[in-house]
Amino acid sequence: MQKKIVVHMYLKNGKAVTGFDGKELLEDGDVMSIAQHYSNNGADELLIFDLSDDDADHEQSLNLIRQISRVIDIPMSGGGHIKNLEDVKKLLYAGCQQVFLNYAKAANIELTEEVSKRFGKEKIAICTDSFAQLQANKARVNEYTSRVILLCDEVDVRTTARLVEVPVLPVSTRAD
């Protein structure tokens, strides 16, 4: 198996921030320069976590994702603020090669089959930090998604990877 360097960025209020709390800017918060830096310095993929609180912020994030897709030379996957099939479509049309559904939200779990059938299994991933959640939805994940993005700070990666048939990408969310 070939190893890849997969980097991630959190978007909040049009800026790159350091984590899910969205309280601190990453460097100066300039999304475009950070994305270009990742692309130009060895990253193989960029994950974008949209931390929008409302639809207006989400539209701003979608515009940034469109701009990022024009200036980077690596695949990009995106997720966050997904409520329905249309939100998945917007991320794909903005330039994401894959969209990940937040499995902490029950509505996203229910959405999995519909978006997979509409856009193809290869375009859909899930994001979780819960072994129990993944175990409860194992059949759905295996049938309708092509990857698990595992927020692994509190989860055993090896045990989780053995649970599902699709690849598991561990992502540490620690800033230290």
Residue ranges of each PLM-predicted region?
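Short amphipathic alpha-helical segments
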Residues: 60, 112-113
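Conserved N-terminal beta1-alpha1 strand-loop-helix module at the mouth
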Residues: 1-74, 82-90, 118-126, 130-149, ...
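Glycine-rich phosphate-binding active-site loops on the catalytic face of alpha/beta enzymes
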Residues: 53, 90-111, 149-156, 171-176
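Conserved phosphate/oxyanion-binding catalytic-loop motifs
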Residues: 78
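Active-site phosphate/pyrophosphate- and oxyanion-stabilizing loops and adjacent acidic/basic residues
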Residues: 66, 113, 158
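Alpha/beta catalytic cores of group-transfer enzymes, especially the acyltransferase/condensing modules
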Residues: 105, 113, 117-122
